[in-house]
Amino acid sequence: MPYGTRYPTLAFHTGGVGESDDGMPPQPFETFCYDSALLQAKIENFNIVPYTSVLPKELFGNILPVDQCTKFFKHGAVLEVIMAGKGAAVAEGTQAIATGVGICWGKDKNGDLIGGWAAEYVEFFPTWIDDEIAESHAKMWLKKSLQHELDLRSVSKHSEFQYFHNYINIKKKFGFCLTALGFLNFENADPVVIQ
């Protein structure tokens, strides 16, 4: 029996950072730092598959903090994510990394929810920062990106933008920072029947 395309109906938001004095070339921050960031984000035992940025309307109101979902996690499962994550080396001039994910929801001409879109933000800083700087920069850039996504599609804003952010001040040689949405439950659209 055929079935239609899959779409997520439950998600969580999370974030993590990692740093290390050790790493393997060519991207040393991708080795130990990335794993540490996944551990802090509580998604270290998933196989991570990145998405682009379109959200079905069924996710509206169904994006939870990661701590509400961890007891349902399955070791070795595939986790589909929208992730803003990057690593850096202090020797290359980066002292801090900020990341963020923003969400906008759109409505049709009748005011009904269509669905949503996400945007990712990553910024490197030459000096240490604090949470206020990380949050304000994330919101500034994500707001611009989310509004662009709505404008590009000629869609009106349904509700307030949502923002999630994270940052690290790197104290070792290498650092990594991530902010992510992870998708847990799925349904299927109706199958396509062409006659």
UniProtKB/Swiss-Prot annotation:
Its cofactor is pyruvate. Binds 1 pyruvoyl group covalently per subunit. Keywords: Cytoplasm, Decarboxylase, Lyase, Pyruvate, Virulence. The keyword Metal-binding does not apply. One of its GO terms (cellular component) is cytoplasm. The modification Pyruvic acid (Ser) is found at residue 53. GO terms for molecular function: arginine decarboxylase activity. The record marks 52-53 as: Cleavage (non-hydrolytic). One of its GO terms (biological process) is arginine catabolic process. Its main location: cytoplasm. It is found in: Cytoplasm. It comes from the Bacteria. Its EC number is 4.1.1.19. It is an enzyme of class 4 (lyase). Trimer of an alpha-beta dimer. Belongs to the pyruvoyl-dependent arginine decarboxylase family. Part of the AaxABC system, catalyzes the decarboxylation of L-arginine. The arginine uptake by the bacterium in the macrophage may be a virulence factor against the host innate immune response. This is Pyruvoyl-dependent arginine decarboxylase AaxB.
